[in-house]
Amino acid sequence: MSKKITLIVLAFFASIFLVACGKSPDVTANANGTKIGDTIKIGVNMELTGAVAAYGKAEQNGIKLAVDEINKAGGVDGKKLELVTKDNKSENAEASTSSTNLAIQNNVNAIVGPATSGAVAAASLVSQKTGVPLL
């Protein structure tokens, strides 16, 4: 029995090793098929006005700082990050609309935000429909 388990474990690690050695695709795309060229477009869906604008503005500043640092260091796999920002006005319905616009009109590869749980719940439905990851 232990010999069988050893063989299964070895086969598992061998398959992981072979997958890791595989060639990556020449063209990359996000889940909804938006191709990633020389830049990776990241949507920012934040509360920049309204009742909880302080949360959204603080997060937006942090995101901008991180993107600037990443781009200065050469980007991600040589690709620069580009931010596309939408103000959801601290409203759940507007958060959904902002995510829809970012995913469909702006063709972003991922969306960061919103900052509040109710807005995230509304935006996550859009993420599920469009296949654009929501962070």
Question: Where in the sequence are the language-model features?
Answer:
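Positively charged n-region of N-terminal signal peptides that target proteins for export
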Residues: 1-5
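Sec-dependent N-terminal signal peptides
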Residues: 7-13
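C-terminal motif of bacterial Sec signal peptides marking the signal peptidase cleavage site
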Residues: 16-20
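Short, low-complexity, disordered segments immediately C-terminal to signal peptides
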Residues: 22-38
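Short coil-to-beta-strand
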Residues: 34-43, 132-135
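Short beta-strand segments enriched in small/hydrophobic residues
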Residues: 38-56, 114
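Flexible, small-residue-rich helix->loop connector segments that border functional cores
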Residues: 64-76
